[in-house]
A protein has these predicted regions:
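The feature captures the beta-strand-to-loop junction immediately N-terminal to the Walker
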Residues: 34-36
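Conserved ABC ATPase "signature" region
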Residues: 96, 107-122
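Catalytic Walker B motif of ABC-type/P-loop ATPase nucleotide-binding domains
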Residues: 151-155
Length: 212
């Protein structure tokens, strides 16, 4: 297992955010989590990524207990909500800076993904000139460019055109075959049907069932 959640709960101002969630994620699979807005999907990803503390329970990533605010033992690729890039810097400069912060930056995978998503013609432009779709593709590249073994994607198809969505889904299937684990959150159940090995429903902070 690359991820294990054991009876994880979280409340904010008395409101249930996550309620007694237990979940195990295997390597080399794509998991989908769907539900209406406000059901807790994004908060679950934030907890796994270590971006949010929990009130009770435990989260293990690659066998290591997740501690809020502490860098994990493995690199996690994350697209949660809007990624804040430096608007006055080029897309490529943003990727380079992020890569260097995380460790030695091998730009070969980033360049491959830029070419794959047809971003070559604007990657050297300032990010503040990007459309929402261009910004979303840049966010996806930063989450995948270091061949992270665990990838958490919150509504990754937002603002993407049909061709880019198809490319993304094909790429995620490729990553699965390479043994990487992907968690995709969407409020659209049908978007996950073809892509995922297993799907879960969230409602009012609770995780329900699973479908293979």
């Amino acid at each position: 297992m690359i991820v294990s959640l054991q009876n994880v709960s979280k409340r904010i101002k008395g409101k249930i955010i996550l309620e007694n969630i237990s979940l195990e994620l295997e390597r080399g699979k794509i998991y989908g989590i769907y539900g209406v807005n406000g059901s807790g999907k994004t908060m679950l990803l934030r907890a796994i990524a270590g971006l949010m503390d929990v009130d009770s329970g435990a989260i293990f990533v690659n066998g290591e207990k997740r501690v809020y605010g502490k860098a994990p033992g493995i690199n996690i690729g994350v697209v949660i909500e809007k990624v804040d890039f430096y608007g006055n810097l080029a897309g490529w400069e943003n990727l380079r800076l992020l890569g260097e912060v995380r460790g030695p930056f091998d730009d070969s995978e980033a360049k491959r993904l830029i070419d794959y998503f047809d971003m070559d013609h604007y990657i050297d432009n300032e990010v503040n000139t990007y459309s929402l779709g261009m910004n979303q593709k840049l966010a996806i590249v930063q989450a995948l460019m270091e061949k992270q073994p665990l990838i958490l994607l919150d509504e990754p198809t937002n603002a993407l055109d049909e061709d880019s969505v198809e490319r993304l889904y094909a790429l995620l299937s490729e990553l699965k075959r390479a043994g990487r684990t992907v968690v995709v959150v969407s409020h659209k159940k049908e978007d996950l049907r073809q892509l995922c090995d297993m799907r879960f429903k969230m409602s009012e902070g609770r995780l329900y069932g699973e479908e293979e």
